[in-house]
């Protein structure tokens, strides 16, 4: 039987409670054999202010994996460097697991930008998109895509970076291990 693999990519700068909720809900819904967190090197459709080295983001993701009790990190995009195109990452995963059933987790913001994605039509033939809706903002999706709804959690990595810089509390926004890591490493302070 083919393996089922979930791919959950992002900058994770830093990884926070909303990311953890998405991962938990998708993992419970799909019940994959493997759940990969994939930190991007440079996301083609995002701004790159407050960029943080991959090693710090990887350490924080690993602490969240330890907290969640599931998941692995795929370092392909960080090791490849340059623009992080999902198509290239999917080809890498399929090279390692040619018979796998792949699920790619994206939010409604990314769903609405799919027309801008690199090799999107080819990509659709290799994966099943899992569109994560937040609370009442349910996105109608194409028939070959899956859709799940999670509670709305208004947390962003930008907000966390800003609060750290302003020496404000982030305790309810990230896991205790991520907060401790941010403080110990002095991340986002300047």
From Swiss-Prot:
Q: Which reaction does it catalyse?
A: nicotinate beta-D-ribonucleotide + ATP + H(+) = deamido-NAD(+) + diphosphate
Annotated pathway = Cofactor biosynthesis; NAD(+) biosynthesis; deamido-NAD(+) from nicotinate D-ribonucleotide: step 1/1
Q: Would the keyword Transmembrane be found if you checked this record's keyword annotation?
A: no
Tell me which InterPro entries the record gives.
Cyt_trans-like, NadD/NMNAT, Rossmann-like_a/b/a_fold
A Gene Ontology molecular-function term? ATP binding
Does this entry carry the keyword NAD?
yes
Which UniProt keywords are given for this protein, alphabetically ordered?
ATP-binding, NAD, Nucleotide-binding, Nucleotidyltransferase, Pyridine nucleotide biosynthesis, Transferase
Q: Name one GO biological process term.
A: NAD biosynthetic process
Enzyme Commission number(s) from the entry: 2.7.7.18
Q: What class of enzyme is it?
A: transferase
Cross-referenced Pfam families, in alphabetical order? CTP_transf_like (PF01467)
Family recorded in the similarity comment: Belongs to the NadD family.
Q: What does this protein do?
A: Catalyzes the reversible adenylation of nicotinate mononucleotide (NaMN) to nicotinic acid adenine dinucleotide (NaAD).
Q: What is this protein called?
A: Probable nicotinate-nucleotide adenylyltransferase
In which organism is this protein found?
Staphylococcus saprophyticus subsp. saprophyticus (strain ATCC 15305 / DSM 20229 / NCIMB 8711 / NCTC 7292 / S-41)
């Amino acid at each position: 039987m083919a393996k089922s693999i979930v791919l959950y990519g992002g900058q994770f700068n830093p990884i926070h409670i909303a990311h953890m909720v998405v991962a938990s809900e998708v993992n419970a819904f799909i019940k994959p054999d493997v759940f990969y967190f994939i930190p991007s090197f440079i996301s083609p459709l995002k701004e790159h202010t407050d960029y943080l080295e991959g090693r710090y983001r990887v350490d924080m993701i690993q602490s969240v994996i330890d907290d969640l009790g599931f998941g692995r990190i795929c370092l392909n995009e960080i090791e490849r460097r340059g623009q992080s195109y999902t198509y290239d990452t999917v080809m890498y995963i399929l090279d390692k697991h040619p018979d796998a059933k792949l699920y790619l987790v994206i939010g409604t913001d990314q769903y609405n930008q799919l027309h801008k994605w690199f090799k999107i039509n080819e990509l659709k033939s290799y994966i099943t998109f899992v569109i994560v809706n937040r609370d009442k903002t349910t996105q109608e999706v194409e028939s070959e895509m899956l859709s799940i709804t999670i509670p709305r959690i208004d947390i962003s990595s930008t907000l966390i970076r800003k609060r750290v810089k302003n020496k404000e509390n982030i305790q309810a926004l990230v896991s205790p291990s991520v907060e401790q890591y941010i403080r110990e490493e002095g991340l986002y302070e300047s």
